[in-house]
């Protein structure tokens, strides 16, 4: 499975499993680009190594309201995927700012990380997506 395929499953799962009122976003900062375009994006604030998904959850979605904060998810392909030096640096800096960060190679890793923090919705759609991803 590619990282893009994994992210597609994770996005579909988040849409049906996150607490109501949650929002998430993907900043398309991966891939090869023309040098001039990369420079433009950098001027606009793009940071190399930024996680794949940013998740924001309303207060009522947290198991412990004291745990509130942004959640960042970095996805890696299941076989051979590893964090770059920029990604490691960004994750450490985000953690110092009180941001939850996880690196995951499977949907099950994302779910296991979020389950103790959030009131996830248990839906049949979430179950189907999980089964499809793990197949």
Across the structure, where does each feature detected by a protein language model lie?
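Catalytic phosphate/metal-binding cores of nucleic-acid and nucleotide-processing enzymes, i.e., regions
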Residues: 1-135
């Amino acid at each position: 499975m590619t990282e893009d395929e994994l992210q597609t499953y994770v996005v579909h799962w988040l849409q049906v499993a996150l607490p109501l009122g949650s929002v998430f976003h993907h900043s398309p900062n991966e891939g090869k680009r023309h040098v001039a375009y990369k420079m433009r994006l950098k001027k606009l604030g793009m940071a190399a190594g930024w996680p794949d998904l940013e998740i924001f959850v309303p207060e009522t979605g947290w198991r412990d309201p004291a745990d509130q904060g942004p959640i960042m998810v970095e996805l890696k392909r299941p076989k051979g995927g590893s964090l770059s030096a920029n990604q490691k640096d960004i994750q450490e800096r985000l953690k110092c700012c009180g941001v939850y960060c996880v690196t995951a190679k499977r949907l099950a890793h994302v779910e296991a990380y979020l389950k103790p923090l959030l009131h996830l919705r248990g839906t049949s759609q979430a179950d189907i997506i999980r089964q499809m991803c793990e197949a």
